[in-house]
Amino acid sequence: MKTSTKFLAIPLLLAAWSAFGAGGGSMPSGGGGDLRPKEQATPEEQARTTYNAGVRAVEKADASSADAARQTDARKQRKANDKARGGYASALKKFTRATELNPRMHESWNYVGYTQRKLGNYVAALAAYERALTLAPGYAEAIEYRGHAYLGLDRLSEAKEAYLMLYSGNRVLADKLLVAMREWIGARRGAPAVDPVVLDAFASWVDERGTIARQTAGLTRAGAGSRWR
């Protein structure tokens, strides 16, 4: 699933210098290079810069992952997947560094979870999402991504809870999670690790929720708007 990337604005640091003398003369020189004090970026500013670099890395990794999904040639698919994994690993380092610089930056914790999940580290991903949601309760993207991690661990009841939370507050992300649930069902069909009875029950629940979502689409602002286009 392609993530919705969000860059954070970085304040511009400018040092104001007045002209020397009444006639706008040159600055005094000590004869030994530029002696002007340089503004040191705060840890929060460094965290934003590092976070934005991580977002760019995630965008590239997502593109490689999508390319791998489209490939029919096994060698090309493997190459694209390897490129995606390298990109996610690089992004994870950046987001982890951002959390070290600013531990209260919930966006960075959310992306730590996202990249960990993309690398298959679902338990670590859940821990990162919990940190994000502790800092920003109700943060919809973290709730959605956590739902994906629950699916990766076959924790279906918790994945359902994540969907229902999103359904009441963010139908767009709820729909994305429902799509992921359908993909999970298709991938798990015939897998020995999943009880067929449990799988069928979950599939029925997903179908039911999909029907409800379609029937109530017009009650949302986006759904109502689409009817008049």
Where do the language-model regions lie?
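Register position in tetratricopeptide repeats
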Residues: 59, 118, 152-153, 187
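Structural signature of tandem alpha-helical TPR/SEL1-like repeats
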Residues: 80-93, 118-131, 154-162
